[in-house]
């Protein structure tokens, strides 16, 4: 269930619980909340509406007395009636059965709460994995669109693999990373996440086991699990995942492939060492093991470049390489790319045509211009400097407010600091208490189901002032919960 950013007015003469009652009633009577819909918990609603729980309880009690809601012990509160069910003798359609039957798994409640609250203007976003609006080159992109030559712009469907000019520009860009692929071996996708979805349904069988780092961004998604696959997390050290662990888990659990973020790993910020990369490549060659290399953050280095990508050392065609503009330029462009063997690219291009007929032509044109005209490298120089300033500020605030209760490693690039508290925390309580303070964090639990004492701290989005306010609030809340 998605709630709008509506808030009751404290300036109104209408009591807060009556405003909430009317808001919820409108959702039910207009059919937005169908019969069978489970509404959020009273605590969640109180956090969303920024009122006391008793206020929400009063609104729900009134709707229950009107026959619109029904609460069941252990089953939450559901919509049981609507205008149509009152006016007709036939029972209304219960969409909840269909919702539960869908093959794609729902996000966890905490991830849903993150997604619902991120658009709020009053929220400090300490977990957001995107550039601040201040770092997005909106003016430059705007000028590019103003200078469009209609003769070179296509508004029709693109080729199955994507705009030829963009694929050529991506191929040239990858040469700078010592990755040599032809445009025909590149597929343009609507962000790296779509590439993972295509791989999950186009290349792998149900019950396949995907090996990945632990913790991992992949654990916060249900791309592979919804396609009937399982994830197997492998612990890392300071140099990344160990080749020996990959090999032993591949043998023991039948791992089909390895998914890895070797440069500025999400969520830990770890950089896989050059030696470890060579070992992983050697293992891939020896065991004929496919690897998905996600290099979304590889260009966002601060002091020095990370070791060359795995794909640059791949001479057997075992690596599927993902790149995107989502982290370096703008998530709104929805442009990424997948480089791999041509038969794989052709297979996934065919599936992509069946799902969306290609990524936005306008976005592909803009991305091609951005790469071919030199805007990208110019922007990277500036954005690296700004991100480094934010990282340094975040580390300073952590030392000031959390130095006695947590540890962390200073990342050499990317967006994230993996902060680990000295004691376990009640994850849900920690998250929602911070939300009450208008601070949004990403608990480590969503990247590793066993984690109870870490958060992924992002310095890419919040302003410096908000970083300090948010980190101070997180440290105060964690300290209090650890002492209770």
From Swiss-Prot:
GO function terms (MF aspect): DNA binding; DNA-binding transcription factor activity; pyridoxal phosphate binding; transaminase activity
Keyword Transport included in the entry's annotation: no
Modified residues (N6-(pyridoxal phosphate)lysine): 327
Annotated HTH gntR-type domain residues: 14-82
GO BP term, pick one: biosynthetic process
CC cofactor: pyridoxal 5'-phosphate
Keywords (A to Z) from UniProt: Aminotransferase, DNA-binding, Pyridoxal phosphate, Transcription, Transcription regulation, Transferase
DNA-binding region in chain numbering: 42-61
Gene3D superfamilies named in the record: Aspartate Aminotransferase, domain 1, Type I PLP-dependent aspartate aminotransferase-like (Major domain), Winged helix-like DNA-binding domain superfamily/Winged helix DNA-binding domain
Pfam families, A to Z: Aminotran_1_2 (PF00155), GntR (PF00392)
Stored PANTHER family: HTH-TYPE TRANSCRIPTIONAL REGULATORY PROTEIN GABR, TRANSCRIPTIONAL REGULATORY PROTEIN
Protein family per UniProt: In the C-terminal section; belongs to the class-I pyridoxal-phosphate-dependent aminotransferase family.
Protein name: Uncharacterized HTH-type transcriptional regulator YisV
């Amino acid at each position: 269930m998605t709630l709008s950013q509506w808030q009751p007015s404290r300036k109104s003469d209408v009591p807060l619980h009556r405003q909430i009652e009317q808001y919820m009633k409108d959702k039910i009577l207009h059919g937005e909340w169908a019969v069978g819909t489970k509404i959020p918990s009273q605590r969640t609603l109180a956090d969303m509406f920024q009122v006391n729980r008793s206020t929400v309880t009063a609104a729900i009690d009134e709707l229950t007395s009107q026959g619109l809601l029904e609460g069941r012990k252990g089953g939450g509160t559901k919509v049981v009636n609507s205008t149509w069910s009152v006016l007709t003798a036939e029972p209304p359609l219960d969409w909840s059965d269909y919702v539960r039957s869908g093959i794609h798994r729902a996000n966890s409640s905490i991830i849903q709460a993150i997604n619902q609250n991120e658009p709020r203007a009053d929220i400090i976003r300490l977990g957001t994995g995107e550039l601040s609006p201040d770092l997005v080159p909106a003016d430059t992109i705007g000028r590019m669109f103003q200078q469009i030559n209609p003769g070179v712009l296509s508004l029709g469907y693109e080729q199955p693999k994507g705009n030829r000019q963009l694929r050529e520009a991506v191929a040239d860009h990858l040469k700078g990373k010592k990755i040599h692929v032809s445009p025909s071996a590149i597929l343009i996708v609507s962000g790296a996440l779509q590439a993972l979805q295509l791989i999950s349904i186009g290349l792998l069988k149900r019950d396949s086991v995907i090996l990945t780092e632990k913790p991992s961004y992949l654990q916060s998604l249900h791309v592979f699990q919804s396609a009937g696959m399982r994830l197997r997390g492998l612990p890392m050290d300071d140099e990344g995942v160990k080749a020996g662990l990959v090999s032993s888990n591949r043998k023991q659990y039948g791992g089909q492939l390895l998914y890895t973020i070797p440069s500025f790993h999400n969520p830990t910020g770890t950089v896989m060492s050059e030696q470890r990369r060579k070992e992983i490549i050697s293992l891939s060659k020896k065991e004929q093991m496919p690897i998905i290399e996600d290099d979304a953050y590889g260009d966002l280095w601060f002091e020095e470049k990370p070791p060359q990508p795995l794909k640059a050392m791949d001479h057997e065609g075992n690596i599927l390489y993902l790149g995107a503009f989502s982290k370096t330029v703008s998530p709104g462009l929805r442009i990424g790319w997948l480089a791999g063997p041509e038969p794989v690219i052709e297979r996934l291009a065919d599936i992509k045509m069946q799902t969306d007929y290609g990524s936005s032509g306008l976005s592909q044109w803009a991305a091609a211009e951005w790469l071919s005209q030199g805007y990208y490298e110019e922007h990277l120089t500036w954005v690296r400097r700004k991100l480094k300033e934010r990282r340094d500020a975040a580390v300073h605030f952590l030392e000031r407010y959390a130095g006695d209760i947590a540890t962390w490693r200073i990342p050499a690039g990317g967006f994230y600091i993996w902060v680990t508290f000295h004691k376990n925390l009640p994850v849900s309580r920690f998250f929602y208490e911070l939300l009450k303070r208008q601070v949004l964090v990403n608990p480590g639990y969503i990247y590793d189901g066993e984690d109870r004492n870490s958060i992924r701290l992002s310095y890419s989005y919040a302003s410096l002032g908000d970083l300090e306010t948010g980190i101070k609030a997180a440290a105060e809340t964690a300290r209090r919960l650890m002492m209770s």
